[in-house]
Amino acid sequence: MGNKSLAEKIAELSKPSTEFDIEDNDLRDNVFDHNGDDDHSNSDSSDDETLKKQHYLAVDKSNIRNENGNLNLGKAYGGKVTSRGDLYESDEESRSLDEHENSEDSDSGISLKTNSESESEDDDEDESESEDKDEVTKEEDSNLTHKRSKLKELMSNERQHIVNRLSQSASNDAVKGFAILQQHKLFDSIIDSRMKVQKSLTNSNVLPIKRDILKGHFATKKTDKYLNQTSEKCFDLLDSILALRSKLLKKDSVLSSSESPKSFNPKKRTLTDYLEATGKQDTVLERYRSSVLSKWSSKIHNAAGSTAISSGKFKAINQSAEQQVINNLSDMDRLIKRTKLNRRQVKPLGYEYHTSQSDITEQGSIDDQNQDIPNENKQTNKSDLSELASIFDDEDFYRVLLNDLVDKKIQSSDPASGLTVSLRSVQQAQKFKKNIDTKASKGRKLRYHIQEQIANFEAPRGGWKWDDNQIDEFFASLLGQKVNMNEVDEDEDHNNDDDEEIVINSNDSFKLFG
């Protein structure tokens, strides 16, 4: 392009050429120019086309097109060479035909009338259908509200039933818990009274066995008075025990009003009368005891399920609680014999333990044969656990009661003790992984276990007693030499140069470090 003159430059500045923006053009076509005239739109479109191509540069055909202008690709790719202008003109012609047909339809009045009539008929049908639908929806709504009300009523009834059942179960649990607490209190009171009686029971075993021994060695002027007072107090205690038992039998409805025994109040109280009264109460209690034991044992087995059955399958005593009690009480001789064992080594007044003369001679012969062995003051187990017919000692049963009481107190004060602790320890042991030393395999690490100190391996014996000669011989032979440490007279000391005669080690000497 050549240089422009000053007048041309001024003219360009006075009439600046509008720049074309594609986004502004599309916005104007879609929003602002939808109501414009056709002529105006056509002129604008032509101006837009010129503006679109104004910045184009004239470019010659490429070398590829020049070289492949007459390229024959076959029948499949056959066609006619056309320009873009011809294609766009055909599209514009089709658009103009469509617009012309639409204008003809709008100009015809008959078509408008028919369309209006058809539309009115369609509106009537739509109104009738909408009315029918409204009626159906109203019926459905009414049915739905009825169903909802029924469902709410059922849910409220079920909720009320659940609440009543929970409250009833809670009240039953509260009653059961209160009954258990009362049973524990009664058991504690009985154990407390048994603990108070234990000391007097132990002291009663110290009394003389025979009345002659009492009168001959220990009786005083007030002995008969004290004996009578003690017997009266014992009878009073028996009366209170019988009254308590009868009261408990009535409370537990074991006895009816007609079967209730008369109050035991004899004019002259003897031991045989009390034995008869307690025997009657025992026969009445036996029926109640058997029913209660069978009832609760079956309940415990049912609650435990298969675990109780499997645990008791291989036991030697696979019997009910009632049968076990009957078996234990049937062997009454064995039970009485256990009460005659002198566990506390009580020595009644006027009674002396003694050993037979044969035991003494036998022990003397053994000591003569083994002179080097120190004498041992043996106390036979017969004297420790001898049977005395005049004592009553149920310490084994008393210890069982005390252990049960202590365990119950510990569990009530600390719920995390006893069985709970063992169960938690087992669960924690199962959770934690075992600490396995992987480096100890294939002999790469020496395995060893530290042995604990041997303590209390054998209980010390207090009956060992050495004489002076044995003690001197022991200390003289500590270093593997035997020294004669016998005392000599002063005259022999002057004659002998050494105070002690050292003898070379012999085969029969006692060695510790030789």
Curated annotation (Swiss-Prot):
Q: Which UniProt keywords apply?
A: Nucleus
- Annotated localization: Nucleus, Nucleolus
InterPro entries reported in the protein's UniProt record: AATF (IPR025160), AATF/Bfr2 (IPR039223), AATF_C (IPR012617)
Output the GO biological process annotations, alphabetical, semicolon-separated.
Answer: maturation of SSU-rRNA from tricistronic rRNA transcript (SSU-rRNA, 5.8S rRNA, LSU-rRNA)
Note the superkingdom of the native organism.
Answer: Eukaryota
Q: What is its main location?
A: nucleus
Polar residues: bias regions: 354-378
Task: Please give the residue ranges the record annotates as the region Disordered.
Answer: 14-153, 353-382
Signal peptide span = none
- Bias category Basic and acidic residues: which stretches? 25-42, 135-144
Q: Which Pfam families match?
A: AATF-Che1, TRAUB
Composition-biased stretches, type Acidic residues, lie in 118-134
GO cellular component, alphabetical, reads: nucleolus; small-subunit processome
What family does the entry list?
A: Belongs to the AATF family.
| Official protein name in the record | Protein BFR2
What is the species of this protein? Answer: Debaryomyces hansenii (strain ATCC 36239 / CBS 767 / BCRC 21394 / JCM 1990 / NBRC 0083 / IGC 2968) (Yeast)
Gene name of this polypeptide? BFR2
